[in-house]
Amino acid sequence: MSHKSDLIATNIQKYLQQRQQKELLRFITCGSVDDGKSTLMGRLLHDSKLIFEDQLASIVADSKKVGTQGDRLDLALLVDGLQSEREQGITIDVAYRYFSTDKRKFIIADTPGHEQYTRNMATGASNCDLAIILIDARKGLQTQTRRHSFICSLLGIKHVIVAVNKMDTVGYSQQIYKSIQDEYLKLAGSLQIPDIRFVPISALDGDNVVSKSPKMPWFRGSPLMHYLETIKIDYAYTDEFRFPVQLVCRPNSEFRGFQGTIVSGSAKIGDTIRVMPSGKITTIKSILSFDGELNEAEAGQSITITTYDEIDISRGDMIVHKDAISHVSSMLRANIVWMSEQPLIEYKDYYIKFLTKQVIGSVNKFNYKTDINTLKEVACGTLELNEIATIELKLSEPVCFDSYQKNRTTGAFIIIDRLTNVTAGAGMVIKPLAANDKKDSTNDYSEFELELNALIRKHFPHWDAKNLRE
């Protein structure tokens, strides 16, 4: 395998150390069918010199058998790995590929363009920081272009690069490129995507992909790879500590710890924490990890927390800092991307899964669904496959969560069919609706303080002590 870095041959340990320290960017390629998404991914891998020699030989052979580019190398075959994908010349599953340059590491999610695979696209986009939306210069904006752009906006992707592909087929026309740019900016006015950039490319020929193309001297911007390497991503959606409890660890009578992965923020020994939804307050006694005891832990780390107080903490609870509480409610408003062939209907019970917490819930009300072509709100009573709607959800018990705009992890949930156990939908919380979202007045006191207050009021009524539970 050839690579730009000479360290692989001279000092492999130093190369691996440098690679580990590089910033990671997760991005998705999306757009309508046959816009060239897989070809673009293949071009990025090929021009970054991250293809093994046997891979290249295999692609050369496959290009002659099932390729769609005549005698030329079909780079899309690098990522269209399923036999059905190669035979049909389309992408069906979400394909993940990994590569790096001198400046960054990348994980690419290549998603399907066909309408029936929109659910796969939503899955691929859920963990991405940036989206490349491809538009065929010959066709302009399609329904799937609008659908994918809207889903990217819903999923909180703040950075979008619009790549106008196949410029070679329209004679590298600046007028066509400008027309598509204006049309997309008009669409973007209805979306919440603050950073949008445009680049005209030919993924097949490599124009403006890794290096600037002399065939489009009128384009004053940078090639696609330059944007990917330099665009600044704000990874910290929130600094508030969120620790969903996955498991209560009790190997013996002397130890009781709470295990899980920190999804945002950080915590250290001695921090005052609150357990949601109960609101009980305690202090962190120790933080344990695979590498031993830690003084502090941050987002992404899997740890075990022990506390000074013996309070009730169970799987599905959320541990937060005392004064940075999450919402607690049994009713909420959310955006839904429906992924099941069976329609979503009112009052039908589903499993609703928030991280480690699973409850039963149903749609209490359809607010509206979104017309993908116009982005207008349309009244509805059901939701079909690949449709997107805003709903009010009623849960069997209060759960803790944040809005999706604030925290993409604690503000997300999935809907599971109770009969088939199939994931039927993906949800993004807008806000809580129930009155029990209000902060409980007892949350300011520990269990010991509440019990002591009750004893004082019982045995010393003449002290006129205030009831802390009221």
UniProtKB/Swiss-Prot annotation:
SUPFAM superfamilies on file: EF-Tu/eEF-1alpha/eIF2-gamma C-terminal domain, P-loop containing nucleoside triphosphate hydrolases, Translation proteins
Gene Ontology terms for molecular function: ATP binding; GTP binding; GTPase activity; guanosine tetraphosphate binding; sulfate adenylyltransferase (ATP) activity
Chain intervals for the UniProt region annotation (G3): 110-113
Enzyme class of the recorded protein, top EC level: transferase
Keyword Ribonucleoprotein: no
Span list, region G2: 89-93
EC number assigned by the record: 2.7.7.4
Residues covered by region (G4): 165-168
Reactions it catalyzes: sulfate + ATP + H(+) = adenosine 5'-phosphosulfate + diphosphate
Key words, A-Z: ATP-binding, GTP-binding, Nucleotide-binding, Nucleotidyltransferase, Transferase
Binding site for GTP: 31-38, 110-114, 165-168
Pfam families: GTP-eEF1A_C, GTP_EFTU, GTP_EFTU_D2
The keyword Magnesium is assigned to this record: no
Domain tr-type G: 22-238
InterPro entries cross-referenced by the UniProt entry: CysN_GTP-bd, CysN_II, CysN_NoDQ_III, EFTu-like_2, G_TR_CS, GTP-eEF1A_C, P-loop_NTPase, Small_GTP-bd
Family matches, as PROSITE patterns: G_TR_1, G_TR_2
Pathway field: Sulfur metabolism; hydrogen sulfide biosynthesis; sulfite from sulfate: step 1/3
Region listing for G5, in residue ranges: 202-204
GO biological process, one term: hydrogen sulfide biosynthetic process
Family: Belongs to the TRAFAC class translation factor GTPase superfamily. Classic translation factor GTPase family. CysN/NodQ subfamily.
Role noted for this protein: With CysD forms the ATP sulfurylase (ATPS) that catalyzes the adenylation of sulfate producing adenosine 5'-phosphosulfate (APS) and diphosphate, the first enzymatic step in sulfur assimilation pathway. APS synthesis involves the formation of a high-energy phosphoric-sulfuric acid anhydride bond driven by GTP hydrolysis by CysN coupled to ATP hydrolysis by CysD.
Quaternary structure and partners: Heterodimer composed of CysD, the smaller subunit, and CysN.
UniProt-recorded name of the protein: Sulfate adenylyltransferase subunit 1
Species this protein is from: Francisella tularensis subsp. tularensis (strain WY96-3418)
